[in-house]
Structure formats: structure tokens, C-alpha cells
């Protein structure tokens, strides 16, 4: 039972979007900061537990990125609705996730069952998204966070989102090309 702890943590992170969205809707940015911080730390914790104790499961390989995407998209949607993040950034994040989803479905339907394989640039993008979310929330809570840090975070998230999209498409297109033209098939 304890070997499923990382999966439970991922599920809780996904569910954390409900109180987080409510807090953001109420402009309770300080409270939202701490909920987001816990959710961000839970992403590190579930991955560490799974790898450290060998509790990696096929379900966890799917739950973790789904929880991450749900968390990031809901948070940036609420930030955009509250005027704290640009709408174009939300749409860029959604476009990246749509590309990943469609690519995953295409791979699964046309080539082979898909094994979730996070890329380093994808992990960096998620880290920057969570960090930027925390910086935006700290700024909105009127803590001593300069607006320039918010702007830098938004720029870094945008760059990482585009770069990781290109990286995923390039990587999986190359794998698909090799698989399609492999002499063994």
C-alpha cells in the first residue's frame, strides 16, 4: 500500500487546483501562495519517493504529468482571469499541452503503446511555471517582490514552453521515423 504513496501525492496535487482556484477567485493571494508552494513541493516529493524506493508504477507515470498539467493550466487560467498573467501565456501553455496530447494519442494509435518519458526541457518548463506562479502570487500578495521578477518569470516560461514543445516534437518525430522505417518491422 505504501508503494502507492507517490500516486496519492500526485492525485492530491491534481485536486489542489480546486482550493487554489477558489483562493485565486477570492483574491486571497497569500493563502494561494502557500497552497501552490505545497503543490509544487509535492511534485518533487512524489518523484523522489518513487525513484528512491522503487515505487515507480505505470499509473504514476501518467498521474504525475496529468497532475502537473492540470495544476499549471488552472493556475495560469486564474492568473490570466485576474489580470496577473498575460492571456497569451495561458494559450501558449495550452497549445503546448495540446501538441503533447495529440502527439501521444497519434503515437499510441498508429505506432505502439506509449510509455511516458519526460524530457529534461519539459521538467525545466514545469519548474519555471511553478516558480513563476509563486513569484506572481508573492507580488500579488504585496510582498516585497519586484514586478521585474514577474516579467522575467513570464518571459522564461514562454521561452521554455516554446523550446520544450519543439524538443518534444523533434524527439518523438525522430523516434516515429526510426520506428516506421525500422528493418525489423
PLM ranges: what are they?
Residues 1-185:
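Alpha-helical transmembrane bundles and membrane-interface segments of multipass inner-membrane proteins
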Amino acid at each position: 500500500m505504501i508503494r502507492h504513496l507517490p500516486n496519492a501525492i500526485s492525485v492530491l496535487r491534481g485536486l489542489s487546483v480546486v482550493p487554489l482556484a477558489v483562493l485565486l477567485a477570492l483574491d486571497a493571494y497569500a493563502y494561494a501562495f502557500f497552497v501552490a508552494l505545497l503543490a509544487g513541493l509535492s511534485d518533487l516529493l512524489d518523484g523522489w519517493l518513487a525513484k528512491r524506493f522503487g515505487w515507480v508504477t505505470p499509473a504514476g507515470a501518467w498521474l504525475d504529468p496529468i497532475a502537473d498539467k492540470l495544476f499549471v493550466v488552472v493556475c495560469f487560467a486564474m492568473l490570466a482571469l485576474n489580470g496577473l498573467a498575460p492571456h497569451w501565456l495561458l494559450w501558449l501553455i495550452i497549445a503546448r499541452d495540446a501538441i503533447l496530447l495529440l502527439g501521444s494519442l497519434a503515437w499510441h494509435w498508429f505506432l505502439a503503446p506509449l510509455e511516458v518519458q519526460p524530457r529534461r526541457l519539459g521538467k525545466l518548463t514545469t519548474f519555471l511555471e511553478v516558480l513563476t506562479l509563486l513569484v506572481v502570487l508573492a507580488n500579488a500578495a504585496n510582498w516585497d517582490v519586484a514586478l521585474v521578477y514577474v516579467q522575467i518569470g513570464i518571459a522564461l516560461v514562454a521561452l521554455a514552453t516554446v523550446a520544450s514543445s519543439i524538443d518534444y516534437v523533434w524527439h518523438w518525430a525522430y523516434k516515429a521515423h526510426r520506428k516506421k522505417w525500422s528493418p525489423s518491422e
